[in-house]
Amino acid sequence: MADEVQLRVEASPENLAGTYSNASIVSTTGAESRIDFLYVDHANAQGDEVPAYLVSRVIMPTTELAHMAETLNDHIAKHLEQGM
């Protein structure tokens, strides 16, 4: 196993504030995957049409997405065990 490094993460004030998303779309082509994070605005639906806005797009290696999915599953399972 490779030596672990400690990352020093820096972020702009805008990125630190975060962005709200209530939906996502994942697509994979070859070695890369894309996650589109959306805000679906149900309050302004007109008939069958519901407006949705892309709030962020993340493109990453598919291998990293697989690692992320495993990490998310572990994290959510632990969270649910604690009773949310």
Where do the model's predicted regions map?
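Positively charged, low-complexity terminal tracts
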Residues: 1-84
